[in-house]
């Protein structure tokens, strides 16, 4: 009513908008009105005095979506502040907060970059690193694999090795683990496989299937060696990719209280 909206929110949207402050997971598909619901949620929190606009952070996957979300929130807050029917004991304070502060909307990658530029030296990570895209990563990985002199434990084309290298490296960033951690787990798996009881009449130490598993373990170790070389080369060139940037930013927020507080 105070926003002059043409359509009222659905019961499901209203439940999200007016839910108690705190963590909330909402699952919604395309066309469900996510942007409008998020904007209304922010207005509800501000109007009820739970937050001021400058304590609101909205993160999305694309720049366009971030711009749309920010614009939508600002428009709705402006309507609320300009409406003379918005009154109450804290209305003037809330209205002043809307006029003098602003929400922050950004993409996940951009926000991670902001954290890294501000606090990267705590890791330490070079705060002026150049962000490279998938094509540049693939090119660097291709050069590295071409220079690899060791025979791979599994039969793979060089393009497949490049793909495997980048895929494993991305998964490591997503799970915030380093090569030593993965190598330890891989070694543990190999030892468990080797320690499995053998068939009573087995003609060889390992069956073909078991040998295939062990070859994959060895291949994974080789990929980890490549990843270590790849990351060293990236550091020397002052490069970071989006996955690393996100992992470093998350690590900063988790391990340094001043980052989370800011």
Q: Residue locations for each model-derived region?
A:
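A generic structural signal for well-ordered alpha-helical segments enriched in polar/charged residues
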Residues: 44, 75, 79, 143-150, ...
